[in-house]
Structures are given as structure tokens and as C-alpha cells.
Amino acid sequence: MMLHAQHMPGQPGAPSLVFLHGFSGDCREWQPVGEQFHGCSRLYIDLPGHGGSAAIPVGGFADVIRLLRATLISYNILKFWLVGYSLGGRVAMMAACQGIPGLCGLVVEGGHPGLQNEQARAERRLSDGRWAERFRHEPLTEVFHDWYQQPVFASLTAQQRQALTALRSQNNGETLAAMLEATSLAVQPDLREALNALAFPFYYLCGERDSKFRALAQEVAATCHVIRNAGHNAHRENPAGVVDSLAQILRL
């Protein structure tokens, strides 16, 4: 089994870029950024529970990474960079730390390296469980209205919140809930030590108004790029700034 994806071929010898979206996004999320890199092969993946992969069930990160590997092989992508946002960033970090074959570099935007104690994991398990129940049983417009009131999204304007709520409400609540539980921070290990031991380039992107993830970026051995005029979802709020950072990282 493989994940649904959109593939754009590039020029021979150019880097292959594999993009992983955030929770409730899909393969279109990274395209305004990725399509600025025409020379590179670009693979935009729908994670399980999302988009064209909505019906694919997973029990945890191991299943997600197994599906990711199968998808890369199906497209004959043997050497690549992973670029992931939020949930996609956490999947990318997990894959990197588990030694996914062919990975040449890692770019994470606003991805959490992991909680560091059992109390924090227990609290997150309860929180994600409550959100999952809401995704299963309540209208998605109501759930996402409240979702985007969380402190991490404080930099969004009312208009941006409204647009995101309308966009994300096109998802399937049941499959979102299942993926939220399967990949919760409550079940993700603390990756800091493993990330600090990576033998290939690791870059971290965060919005200048995203104080939480700017602080987390200092806890991993990554080169940090701060995206101006952006909060947690920097590639949506300032795509040109993220394009500039990726061009520097990839030396294009």
C-alpha cells in the first residue's frame, strides 16, 4: 500500500523534494512554495487520514513511515530531502531518526521534537483525546473554529482563521481523529538526542511571531531560519520568505 501523492518531475541531477503537510492539510498545502523549484523533482504527499489517503488507517508512526517508504519507492525516489510542516515535520523527524534510506537532508517548519516527561505526555493524551472526540461527533466548522483559537495560532487574523476553518472543514472528521490519536505528541518519543546525532543537514524554519517554536528550535542541533511576518504556519503566511529560505538551504 502507498500514500496518495502528486509528483512533478524535475531535471536530472537536481534534488528531489518530498513535502509533508500539517494536520488537516493535504498535498496542496506546500505547492505554492514547492512549485517555485521547477528544476527539482517534487512529491506532495497526502498523509493517512487526509486528502486522497483519508481511507488509509494507521496505528502509529511506524505505519506512517512504512507507507512513506513504500510511496517513495513507487515513485523511484531514491535520494531526497524531506520538508515537513507541524505534523508533517514530526513525521519527517521520526523518519530521519529511524534512518529512512535515501534521506539527504531535513527541513522542518514548526515541528515539535517531543515531550520530555510522562506528565506532559499524559496531559497531551487527554487533550488530543478530547479533540478527537469532537472531530468524530461535532460539525467540523465548529471544531475548527475552536481549533484555531489555540495559543499557537494567536498570530492569525480573524479573516485568516475564517479561511482556514472553511478549508479544513472539507476533511473527514473520523479519519482526522484517528490520525490525531495515532500520531499524538503523547506517543511520540523525545527526538532531541537522535536529531542532534544526524549525519546530514538539518534545518528548522519558524515564524518570527511563533514564540513557542522559536524556543523549541533552540533545543535541537539545527540551523534555524526565522521567517519574517509569520506565525506558526509560516509557509502559508509568508510563502515568499519560506521560498527564499529553501533556496538558500538547497543552494539553488
UniProtKB/Swiss-Prot annotation:
The keyword Lyase applies. InterPro entries: AB_hydrolase_1, AB_hydrolase_fold, SHCHC_synthase_MenH. Gene3D superfamilies: alpha/beta hydrolase. Keywords: Lyase, Menaquinone biosynthesis. Pathway: Quinol/quinone metabolism; 1,4-dihydroxy-2-naphthoate biosynthesis; 1,4-dihydroxy-2-naphthoate from chorismate: step 3/7; Quinol/quinone metabolism; menaquinone biosynthesis. Pfam families: Abhydrolase_6 (PF12697). One of its GO terms (biological process) is menaquinone biosynthetic process. The keyword Transcription does not apply. Catalyzes a proton abstraction reaction that results in 2,5-elimination of pyruvate from 2-succinyl-5-enolpyruvyl-6-hydroxy-3-cyclohexene-1-carboxylate (SEPHCHC) and the formation of 2-succinyl-6-hydroxy-2,4-cyclohexadiene-1-carboxylate (SHCHC). Monomer. This is 2-succinyl-6-hydroxy-2,4-cyclohexadiene-1-carboxylate synthase. It comes from Salmonella enteritidis PT4 (strain P125109).
